[in-house]
């Protein structure tokens, strides 16, 4: 994951985050994705200091097969039963928006630490394929998701 952020004025910034995971895991399991997420932030004090609230949009391409993201071991994820996710390949895209809250702590003049969380919406379009690799298309569908869209801790380095 890589991101950058620029100051617009004393209390507003604009950030752009890009996330990329190209790897396959053992047994041809995969959790591939490419995500772009711009965000506008309003800092409650001064930019890059203390609390901020933000508005973001996100777009991603994904290809999941044979494994569940984020430790979803029981129940459902995005309205799909876990055994379907573990036994099928889902390939598609998502687009959505969210609101965020975060906080930055100064570590030194060049370094900060940031913690943040976002809630929002994502519309997913996907194609579902069975096993093994190369299996035919089972269905084309979509679903809507409301909930946690991002959570993280970041190390921030200032380029001056």
Residues of each region from the PLM?
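Internal, hydrophobic beta-strand segments that form the core of beta-sheet-rich folds
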Residues: 115-121
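Residue-level preference for long, well-ordered alpha-helices that form the structural scaffold
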Residues: 90, 141-144
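Residue-level detector of alpha-helical segments with a strong bias toward transmembrane helices
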Residues: 119, 128-130
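Solvent-exposed, glycine/polar-rich loop segments of beta-barrel outer-membrane systems
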Residues: 74-78, 130-141
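Outer-membrane beta-barrel "beta-signal"
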Residues: 145-160
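Gram-negative (and chloroplast) outer-membrane scaffold detector with strong preference
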Residues: 5-115, 154-157
